[in-house]
């Protein structure tokens, strides 16, 4: 197959979402879902592509064990839909309602799917669902997790922090950070560690963005805005130990380029860097200490509105020629996307102002991922 070693670009176009695929030879397959299955994702906003491993394939029954064989899938997610797509063929094996034990509430609004070593998670209308990929015979998402024992209303933001032992989400109803377990029926309220500058609970903040440098890290970052005074924004330096956290504030002046930024991503390698986009400018910000220090990156950016940013490192042991370390930027102009990748140097800055990677197609890019035959979530 040629569908499991290359680049997938999740995009929106004409009120639908689909994926373009580029293999390692540079060959392009447009609208993979439409071409292979005759249907696309509903929704006009492409959100995220997640990889799921050990997913029970409902079309591949093992007659000896009477169980479904496991496979690797992509979860392309829009603001209105998500599907399970077999990586080896690019074909849809489960539509959104088929991915659940019980029919999910309508209108469908996933927005986010993510995985940890323990469980595979998905959102719908801000509610959390999960299953255990290694032990689940059917790979069906559970009934929704409750906020607490009193079933208070909640709505989890699409921005996640990958802490240990549980990922950390933000409840937009109570404006509180919560741990999202893959082994119980309720979310877990975070507790404050000594020295925190902001309680994890009832923050009275809007979460504009959040992320982690890597899986199972203790250091995380967020961009937050005060609800009572929306002109006040800050970068939150978050340390998580178990289900406790401490938050330090790096307040942003209105003249700071990060104050008016529209997109953020972290460097996921060794560098303590936050990248962001302000207008048609690309910036980096050292987050090794408070306050952070900004630096404008002089690179040749694609034309049009910049709508996507992501750091994507990939290392193959003993094969440096197959490894890469890209800062990806996506733009849209006249209904067409352009995605470029800048090779980063050892300190996390573009080694060359010209991009080393380039993709172009129809639609507006929402996410980009790289896959290979033994990829895991």
Question: What does each of the following model-derived ranges do?
Answer:
Residues 326-377:
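Blade-level signature of beta-propeller repeat domains, shared across WD40, Kelch, NHL, RCC1
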Residues 7, 73-74, 120, 167, ...:
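Hydrophobic beta-strand positions that form the internal "hydrophobic ladder"
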Residues 81-296:
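Acidic, serine/threonine- and glycine-rich low-complexity intrinsically disordered segments
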Residues 26, 89, 289-291, 344-348:
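Short coil turn/linker residues within repeat-based beta-strand modules
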Residues 1-4:
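Beta-strand-enriched, solvent-exposed domains that form extended recognition/catalytic surfaces
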Residues 41-47, 201, 255-260, 301-315, ...:
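Repeat-based blade/solenoid architectures
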Residues 257-341:
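Loop/turn-rich, solvent-exposed surfaces of beta-rich toroidal or solenoidal domains
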Residues 7-81:
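Conserved, compact domain cores that house catalytic/ligand-binding motifs in diverse enzymes
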């Amino acid at each position: 197959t040629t569908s499991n070693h290359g680049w997938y670009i999740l995009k929106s176009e004409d009120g639908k979402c689909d994926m373009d695929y580029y293999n390692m030879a540079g060959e392009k397959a447009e609208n993979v879902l439409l071409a292979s299955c005759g249907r696309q994702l509903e929704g006009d906003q492409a959100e995220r592509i997640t990889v799921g491993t050990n997913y029970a394939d409902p079309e591949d029954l093992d007659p000896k064990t009477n169980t479904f064989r496991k496979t690797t899938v992509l979860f392309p997610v829009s603001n209105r839909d998500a599907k399970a797509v077999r990586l080896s063929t690019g074909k849809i094996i489960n539509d959104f309602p088929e991915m659940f034990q019980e029919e999910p509430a309508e209108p469908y609004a996933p927005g986010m799917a993510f995985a940890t070593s323990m469980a595979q998670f998905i959102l719908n209308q801000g509610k959390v669902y999960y299953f255990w990929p290694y032990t689940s015979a059917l790979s069906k998402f559970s009934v929704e997790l409750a906020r607490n024992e009193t079933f208070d209303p909640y709505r989890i933001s699409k921005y996640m922090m990958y802490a240990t032992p549980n990922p950390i989400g933000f409840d937009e109803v109570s404006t509180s950070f919560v741990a999202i377990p893959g082994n119980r029926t309720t979310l877990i309220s975070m507790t404050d560690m000594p020295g925190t500058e902001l309680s994890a609970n009832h923050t009275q903040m809007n979460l504009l963005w959040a992320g982690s440098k890597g899986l199972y890290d203790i250091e995380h970052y967020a961009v937050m805005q005060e609800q009572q005074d929306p002109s006040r924004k800050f970068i939150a330096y978050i340390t998580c130990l178990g289900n406790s956290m401490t938050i330090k504030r790096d307040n942003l002046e209105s003249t700071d380029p990060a104050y008016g930024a529209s997109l953020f991503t972290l460097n996921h390698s060794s560098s303590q860097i936050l990248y962001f986009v302000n207008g048609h400018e690309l910036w980096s910000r050292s987050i090794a200490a408070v306050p952070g220090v900004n630096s404008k990156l002089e690179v040749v950016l694609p034309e049009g509105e910049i709508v996507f940013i992501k750091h994507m490192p990939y290392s193959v042991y003993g094969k440096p020629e197959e490894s890469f370390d890209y800062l990806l930027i996506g733009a849209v102009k006249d209904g067409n996307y352009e995605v470029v990748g800048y090779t980063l140097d050892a300190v996390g800055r573009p080694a060359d102002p010209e991009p080393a990677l380039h993709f172009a197609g129809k639609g507006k890019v929402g996410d980009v991922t790289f896959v290979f035959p033994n990829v895991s979530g």
